[in-house]
Curated annotation (Swiss-Prot):
EC numbers on record: 3.5.1.103
Highest taxon, organism lineage: Bacteria
GO molecular-function terms, A-Z: N-acetylglucosaminylinositol deacetylase activity; zinc ion binding
Protein name from the UniProt record: 1D-myo-inositol 2-acetamido-2-deoxy-alpha-D-glucopyranoside deacetylase
Role according to the record: Catalyzes the deacetylation of 1D-myo-inositol 2-acetamido-2-deoxy-alpha-D-glucopyranoside (GlcNAc-Ins) in the mycothiol biosynthesis pathway.
Family stated for the protein in its record: Belongs to the MshB deacetylase family.
Pfam families, per database record: PIG-L (PF02585)
């Protein structure tokens, strides 16, 4: 029996990725009544844990982090009103492969070694839900993590395969970050810090070096989604991933375990890679992932 939604489906590698890059988009479309499904490929077992409370859960200790991150993902999706988690192949089918060059990639369940089974699992989801919009990663997986790169390949292959088996996804996007917007907000943080103004860099954090945060040239971005009205939901979702993310007291930035400040942007960015581009605004970009599709997004 089909449970087709015609909504938005996003494919992410680990718990927290859905919030960092697309949390505002999820919250915006849910606020408009659009069905949203987040498919997560691993449990994020190899993540570095912030603080001492849950440090013993790490992969090199009790190796229980993945189970706890299911809870964090559940809380984050609840904050975004996106429903319960959905894991590719079922929770625990594939394991976090770790950063490039680490031994964790040799684990028999490492996602980088998932093969055709992962593609088929996602095809089944696409044929079941028949989303009108799918969001995945670019070929570099954003910042080059092996699981992100694998998620890109799995999503791309699954979208193509689903088209041959009855559901041609109308619009397929990559989630990216606009380099100009990232620089604008990072420079604003630097000025606040230098002047000792409210919202300065938290103690122990540092500003990102040039090209340290993943981003793409602004002229490659096709679509901007305004998420300013739902930033409270995105911040709540970021805080839900407490083993991985710290949100600054100002709420304007967050940091991973490396303490590099990343801005919580008022917009999220995409590149349309499959489907017809919809009507554009004065900036030459779409401002709705469903732009140009028949019927409203809500």
């Amino acid at each position: 029996m089909s449970t087709a939604t015609g909504g938005l489906l996003l494919v992410h590698a680990h718990p927290d990725d859905e919030t960092i890059t697309t949390g505002g988009t999820i919250a915006r479309y849910r606020a408009r009544g659009v069905p949203v499904t987040v498919v997560t490929c691993t449990l994020g077992e190899e993540g570095e844990v912030i603080g001492e409370q849950w440090a013993q859960l790490a992969a090199d200790r009790a190796d229980q982090l993945g189970g706890y991150r299911i809870l964090e993902l559940t809380r984050a999706l609840d904050a975004l009103d996106a429903g319960p988690p959905r894991f590719l192949g079922g929770a625990g089918r594939w394991r976090d492969s770790g950063m490039a060059g680490t031994p964790s990639a040799e684990h028999p369940r490492a996602f980088v070694n998932s093969g055709p089974e992962a593609v088929e699992a996602l095809v089944e989801v696409l044929l079941d839900l028949r989303p009108r919009v799918v969001v995945g990663y670019d070929p570099n997986g954003g910042y080059g993590h092996p699981d992100h790169i694998r998620a890109h390949r799995v999503t791309t292959e699954a979208v193509r395969a689903a088209a041959e088996r009855g559901w041609d996804v109308p619009k397929f996007y990559w989630t990216v970050t606009d380099a100009d917007m990232l620089r604008l907000h990072t420079e604003a943080l630097a000025r606040r810090t230098a002047a000792g103004l409210p919202g300065a860099l938290p103690r122990g954090w540092r500003l990102p070096a040039a090209d340290e945060l993943a981003c793409v040239a602004s002229d490659t971005v096709t679509t901007t989604v305004d998420v300013a009205e739902v930033l409270a939901a995105k911040r709540a979702a970021l805080r839900a991933h407490a083993t991985q993310i710290t949100v600054a007291p100002s709420g304007r930035e967050f940091a991973l375990s490396n303490n590099i400040a990343q801005p919580v942007l008022p917009e999220e960015h995409y590149v349309l890679v499959r489907g017809r581009r919809g009507p554009a605004g004065p900036d030459g970009r779409e401002h709705d992932l469903f732009a140009g599709l028949d019927g409203p997004a809500t």
